[in-house]
Amino acid sequence: MKPNRSTISILVAGCLTGSVAVAADGPSPDGASACAYTADVLARPRLRGVMSPGRDMTEDDFKALADWGATLLRFQMIRDWHSVNGNQDLDEYDRWLEGRLDHFDRVVLPMARKHGILVVLDLHVPPGGYDASHEANMFHDARFADHFVELWRRIARRFKGREGIYGYDLVNEPLQAREALPDCDHWNLLRRAAEAVRAEDPHVPIVVESNQCASPSQFAGLRPLPFVNVIYQFHVYWPWEFTHQRVLNTRMWTVEWPDDSHGWNRAAIDWTLKPVVAFQRKYGARVYAGEFSAVAWAPGAERYLRDCISLFEEHGWDWTYHAFREWSGWSVEHETAAPGRPSVPSADNPRKRALLDGFRGRISAAQPSER
């Protein structure tokens, strides 16, 4: 789809005033426009951090993150993530969402600014919820799709000009597998939401996740949205047999990292990220690794984290670990020997050391995990 008139106006005005920098040279070979970013977005330092807990956040949370060296928080507005066909009473959904936005406005943003942390505003559960296959219903029901677009218009109007926002993360892990309604497929629905944001706020970055639950593979067919300051996000939990071993099925076998018998190592993670790297280079895109993790009892979890972080650093990507003070299985402040065993608070462990080394810039492309 070609940029509409308002989009072209934003791009032209920015280029004429010198406020917009195009991160790649001209159009790409497929005719899509190169990504464009304002100078302040291009000048951001590397940002490293965590996913928020689902609960309200406290001063202690932010103090801990600052002490660790984190500079980025992905604030997830989440509830009923596993429910089927939830979040369909839109009046009630809006009341819940306003409550989360109030907490973001009154607590999260001020505390984050105080501690030098930028915040991603993440809509983790869309209006209309998910069907039994976890496909978002808004791709197949115009009522939910239209509501999604308009809620982002309201959010952008409310937070226009506010400091400390890394970007508006339009929807977490979108999944559209079946044919969508016209103008409601993954790309077009996110385009419509981005257009609504830009009608209210021409500057704050928009964060777009690839289809198939933010899959790196989906970057192969992704086209940039025709707006300034769009950041492209992926998640990596590969191989799932390692990162999620015995999380949903306690009878799964135990897998160690790395496992060369399966070809599971740093080079294999790098291979799965090739479509993201190609997209970044082709369009000059800013890229953000929004989620990665390995469950606490996975043998070699700390090596997996170091390998992921070293790749993010190699490619110049911001990143956030999943998750901070959420479930103990992901928490680096707990140690758990196996599923069903009690979680033990832990002030120091190999996974936490890996994460803090990452925050403090001590993991580079030349310093992956050691066997």
Predicted regions and their residues:
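Aromatic-lined substrate-binding rim segments of carbohydrate-active enzymes
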Residues: D60-G128, H186-D201, Y304-F312
